[in-house]
Amino acid sequence: MASLGLSFPPAAKTPTYLASSSSTFFSNSSLSVRTSQFRSRNSVFACVKCDMPESLNVGNGNPSIPIINERTLPKFLESARMEKSVNRTNTRLKLFSGTANPALAQEIAWYMGLDLGKVNIKRFADGEIYVQLQESVRGCDVYLVQPTCTPTNENLMELLIMVDACRRASAKKVTAVIPYFGYARADRKTQGRESIAAKLVANLITEAGADRVLACDLHSGQSMGYFDIPVDHVYCQPVILDYLASKSIPSEDLVVVSPDVGGVARARAFAKKLSDAPLAIVDKRRSGHNVAEVMNLIGDVRGKVAIMVDDMIDTAGTIVKGAALLHQEGAREVYACCTHAVFSPPAIERLSGGLLQEVIVTNTLPVAEKNYFPQLTILSVANLLGETIWRVHDDSSVSSIFL
């Protein structure tokens, strides 16, 4: 039976990171970083310093990808864990990656001072998935990094099989690290005879044998209640806030905008940490799935720098129509800040249309090179996830990271 395998080496190379300066909240320093080379999807970013603008050989423009390293940690993290890590060859903490986002997993491993665990993942000719752990996990605290992004069902099934493999190999604890949780939007019924797929997926992960879930910026907080196991909800706002602070935008010019009524709580929390900026709300009504209609604006944005905050960008209809309304109401500039870059067609065409000054996302799921465009900025959440994993492993407080 034919198969396609993915095997991680016993000691993956440490990635090279780049950032121009250390940033702190609302400092006068500026962060401007360009990458000059990218490896394939199954490797980490390779970055070199560019003192002058240098074109990338990509179709849609030059993405700006600041990646945090030990010199440029945001203020909420004190230092990298390299010097604090346990013996690499004799540890009860194991970190494995699925095939969905191995670049992020490698960055997390670098921050933690660990090597990624060796695992062989295959796709058989009929589409079945095969997983074999190539090192012992007996009695270990195992963390599996696997966002359930596109192809959603395939990546979800791979995660379930990885969890099962760890459980059958006598791992002491298995934590599913899910930077992007697919099906999170199916968290309630909006019409009769619909399923609540988020609850179903939570049940599948639990029944597969996971002891804990670590997820980033869930679509709704109540999704945590669908699990019968502990869930650590990681908020990626500090990474985005730290980057915005490096742009030195005067606080009196800022206004935080929620693209819909449902995101008001998220935008309010963001505004409070962004110099307690004023809040505006875009009132929209949906006529169907992935279709948004902007109706009205609540709040004043005239002459302001508008920061639109949401958990994800899918087809970008909400963000782009909201940006058009903000410009119509007199906003000077519009930024979009979202954790998850889903980027389903026709998102790239919409986002690169000129309405947005900058589109700021994170690397919770991989962004294909074909989807790069000049306004795109990708921030790494590897340090945030790495620190969270360490604290869970050490039985320390996780919530204190975000206070």
From Swiss-Prot:
Cofactor note: Binds 1 Mg(2+) ion per subunit.
Enzyme class: transferase
UniProt subcellular location: Plastid, Chloroplast
Keyword Chloroplast annotated: yes
Residue segments, region Binding of phosphoribosylpyrophosphate: 303-318
Catalytic activity: D-ribose 5-phosphate + ATP = 5-phospho-alpha-D-ribose 1-diphosphate + AMP + H(+)
Protein family per UniProt: Belongs to the ribose-phosphate pyrophosphokinase family.
Protein name: Ribose-phosphate pyrophosphokinase 1, chloroplastic
Designated gene of the protein: PRS1
